[in-house]
A protein has these predicted regions:
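A detector for short, charged/polar N-terminal pre-domain segments
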Residues: 1-7
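Helix-turn-helix DNA-binding elements, focusing on the entry/boundary residues of the two helices
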Residues: 12, 23, 34, 49-52
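Residue-level detection of the helix-turn-helix DNA-binding "recognition helix"
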Residues: 17, 31, 42, 53
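Recognition helix of helix-turn-helix/homeodomain-like DNA-binding domains
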Residues: 32-46
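DNA major-groove recognition helix of helix-turn-helix/homeodomain DNA-binding modules
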Residues: 50-65
């Protein structure tokens, strides 16, 4: 598990929860399985730039909000 991936996943999860969205909601917006979102949020998967863009779009936030400290 990569520390950067874990931090990214925690940011994505925090934003998702603040918006009142479930992992299933985000997964549906991205057309992926809920377990894929879960693995990203837990830092198990190292998302590509394209996936980060898709997550940002699904969460309706600028990509920078997901990757900046």
């Amino acid at each position: 598990m990569n520390n950067i991936s874990k931090q990214f996943g925690q940011r994505a999860r925090t934003i998702r929860l603040k918006q009142g969205l479930s992992q299933g909601d985000v997964a549906k917006r991205m057309n992926v399985h809920r377990s894929y979102i879960s693995s990203i949020e837990r830092g198990i998967r190292n998302p590509s730039l394209k996936v980060i863009q898709r997550i940002a779009k699904a969460l309706e936030v600028p990509m920078e909000k997901l990757i900046k400290d």
